[in-house]
A protein has these predicted regions:
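DNA-contacting surface of Y-family translesion DNA polymerases
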Residues: 187, 195-339
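Gly/Gly-Pro- and Ser/Thr-rich, intrinsically disordered tail segments characteristic of DNA damage-repair
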Residues: 1-229, 235, 281, 365-412
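Short, hydrophobic beta-strand segments
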Residues: 113-118, 306-309, 356-361
Length: 412
């Protein structure tokens, strides 16, 4: 039986979700004006997390500092990130997908794969049911998605990127020569900038050129493992299964997928800080501490890699969790591979009253815990954007707050 995989991707998720909320309240639709999510307009700090199509026309790009974006587009409407809203909408669109698909794999806050294999009796026309899913999400939730239809995850994801927004695209095996092969080789997943430059220098300019090239030659150019992977991808070969989500881990997790890859340690550290800040705050709100930290990264090959480590003792202190996350990240990342996703998970939990008291008071930890409590109280009273936590170390403080971004709840 041929597999049938859908990839459902929210169009400019953060901006679309904020726009839908404002449109429901009778305000201007952010999707139709120069607008963006992220940062502080008055302080001109933070980064652009998402942008509208009109903002893109002014040259505004995801990941750039707010100050730079405002110089390009002085009339840019900025909305602060609201991760409770994002989590709510993410759960809602996944719930719609579950009505139609027997197996759903959520791969980030704004995208999922549906394994529709064997549903032909229920849904004889895959394109028709994809339109129903897409239109149901819009009519019930107020935002648009793209749906890619293909025999595997790679082609489904490529298809969902063809033309946006609010579109359904197919990419079956017989369509590969017409739809996939003419695309620039750099648009193929797992082909990063440096790999694309090597291939282009060797006159391999399109995905079709790569597909028809000799595998051994590609491996000499790019390495044995990567060469085999991208050669397979260029020919539409991918056997990765759609994985139903396992039983929920008893922990707290945050993850984020960025439109622009993370390529520097400074960017990664600031995102890790934001993740730890957000997830630790939620853990403290439940009067819990964790004894284990896990850091997850994902490159352009769709594969997650994780490291975890136990702490000397359970903690709820953001600075300690951030320090451990940085250590784990340094063990995971080679410093070269562009990263699309970063995640932090806290588990092996206990109540904050179950921690063994020490005979010797750690004043540094107590100061850090009081700082965390103060930040939590201010945010609880004035909102999550009321106070922005600076870098934990002097080294990362030099980068400043411009890469600061709290990110989506991934578990609790």
């Amino acid at each position: 039986m041929q597999r049938l995989i859908f990839h459902v991707d929210v169009n400019s998720a953060f901006l679309s979700w904020e726009a839908a909320r404002r449109a429901a309240a009778g305000e201007a639709d952010l999707r139709l004006i120069p607008s963006a999510i992220g940062g502080d307009r008055d302080k001109r700090t933070g980064i652009i997390l998402a942008k509208s199509i009109p903002a893109k026309a002014f040259g505004v790009t995801t990941g750039e500092p707010v100050g730079m974006a405002l110089r390009k587009c002085p009339q840019l409407v900025l909305a602060p990130p609201d991760f409770r809203l994002y989590s709510k909408n993410s759960n809602a669109f996944i719930a719609v997908c579950r009505r139609y698909a027997p197996v759903v794999e959520q791969v980030s806050i704004d995208e999922c794969f549906l394994d529709m294999t064997g549903t032909g009796l229920l849904y004889p026309d895959p394109v028709a049911i994809a339109h129903i899913i897409k239109d149901t999400i819009f009519s019930e939730l107020g935002f648009t998605v793209n749906v890619g239809i293909a025999p595997n995850k790679l082609l489904a994801k490529m298809a969902s990127d063809f033309e946006k927004p609010d579109k359904v695209h197919t990419l079956f095996a017989h369509e590969i020569p017409q739809k996939l092969w003419p695309l620039p080789v750099g648009s193929l997943f797992s082909v990063g900038r440096s790999t694309a430059e090597k291939l282009t220098a060797a006159r391999i300019r399109t995905i079709g050129d790569l597909a028809q090239a000799d595998l051994a030659y590609i491996q000499r150019l790019t390495g044995v493992k990567l060469g085999k992977l991208i050669h397979d991808y260029s020919n539409g070969i991918d056997d990765a299964p759609v994985l139903s989500e396992p039983e929920a881990v008893k922990g707290y997790g945050n993850s984020v997928t960025l439109e622009q890859d993370v390529t520097t340690l400074a960017q990664a550290n600031q995102i890790l800080l934001a993740l730890c800040d957000s997830v630790a705050s939620r853990m403290r709100a439940d009067s819990r501490r964790c004894a284990c930290v896990t850091v997850t990264i994902r490159g352009n090959d769709f594969r997650n890699r994780s490291h975890q480590r136990r702490l000397p003792e359970p903690t709820d202190v953001t600075a300690e969790l951030y320090a451990m996350s940085r250590t784990l990240f340094s063990e995971l990342w080679d410093g070269v591979t562009p990263l699309r996703l970063l995640g932090v998970t806290l588990n092996d939990l206990c109540g904050d009253d179950a921690v063994q008291l020490s005979l010797f008071r750690d004043e540094k930890k107590e100061r850090a815990r009081k700082l965390d409590q103060t930040v939590d109280q201010l945010r609880g009273k004035f909102g999550v954007t009321a106070i922005s936590r600076g870098s934990v170390t002097d080294a990362s403080r030099r980068v400043g707050r411009k890469y600061k971004a709290e990110l989506d709840p991934g578990q609790k």
